[in-house]
């Protein structure tokens, strides 16, 4: 942690094809070992597949998927009197977006299709239709928060 105030949050540039900062952030989450070109190729190929299969604009499908994946509540461990409680807290907007992107990439990597662009396209389409592993993760997170609602008064 810096001694002289907080570090300024850097803003990402919108991507050149779709002119969207969200797409740039997805490329950054996809990127492994700094290979941005490879990550952007995978994403744009996945968006082409979405366009072919759904007939809709891929950016709209992706934004719908993000809306369905982003969590509203999560639990955070809080130690009180020698025992740990899972305290439900509201998720900040920037963290919601980050978690949504992280879960889409994580669960698309675990899918069984042959290429990563296929996996990503299918996971985004599933998320847009409110199915898929990323949406299930969000539901599980909300269930955990709901089950621990009794400890909500421990919020800080």
UniProtKB/Swiss-Prot annotation:
InterPro entries from the UniProt entry: Ribosomal_uS7 (IPR000235), Ribosomal_uS7_bac/org-type (IPR005717), Ribosomal_uS7_CS (IPR020606), Ribosomal_uS7_dom (IPR023798), Ribosomal_uS7_dom_sf (IPR036823)
Give any GO molecular function from the UniProt entry: rRNA binding
Query: Per the similarity annotation, which family is this?
Result: Belongs to the universal ribosomal protein uS7 family.
Query: Pfam families, from UniProt?
Result: Ribosomal_S7 (PF00177)
Any Gene Ontology CC annotation: small ribosomal subunit
Q: Which gene encodes it?
A: rpsG
Describe the task this protein carries out: One of the primary rRNA binding proteins, it binds directly to 16S rRNA where it nucleates assembly of the head domain of the 30S subunit. Is located at the subunit interface close to the decoding center, probably blocks exit of the E-site tRNA.
Domain of life per record: Bacteria
* Keywords of this entry: Ribonucleoprotein, Ribosomal protein, RNA-binding, rRNA-binding, tRNA-binding
Q: How does it assemble?
A: Part of the 30S ribosomal subunit. Contacts proteins S9 and S11.
> What is this protein identified as?
Small ribosomal subunit protein uS7
Among the GO biological process terms of this entry, one is: translation
């Amino acid at each position: 942690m810096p001694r002289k105030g907080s570090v300024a949050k850097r803003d990402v540039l919108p991507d050149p094809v779709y002119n969207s900062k969200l797409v740039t952030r997805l490329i950054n989450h996809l990127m492994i070992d700094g290979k941005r070109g490879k990550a952007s190729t995978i994403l744009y190929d996945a968006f082409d597949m979405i366009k072919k299969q759904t007939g809709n604009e891929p950016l709209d499908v992706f934004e719908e998927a993000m809306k369905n994946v982003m969590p509203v509540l999560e639990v955070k461990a809080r130690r009180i009197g020698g025992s740990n409680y899972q305290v439900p807290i509201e998720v900040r907007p920037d963290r919601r977006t980050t978690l949504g992107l992280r879960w889409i990439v994580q669960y698309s990597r675990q899918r069984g299709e042959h290429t990563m662009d296929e996996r990503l396209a299918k996971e985004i389409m599933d998320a847009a239709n409110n199915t898929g592993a990323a949406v299930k993760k969000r539901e599980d997170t909300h269930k955990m928060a709901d089950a621990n609602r009794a400890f909500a008064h421990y919020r800080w």
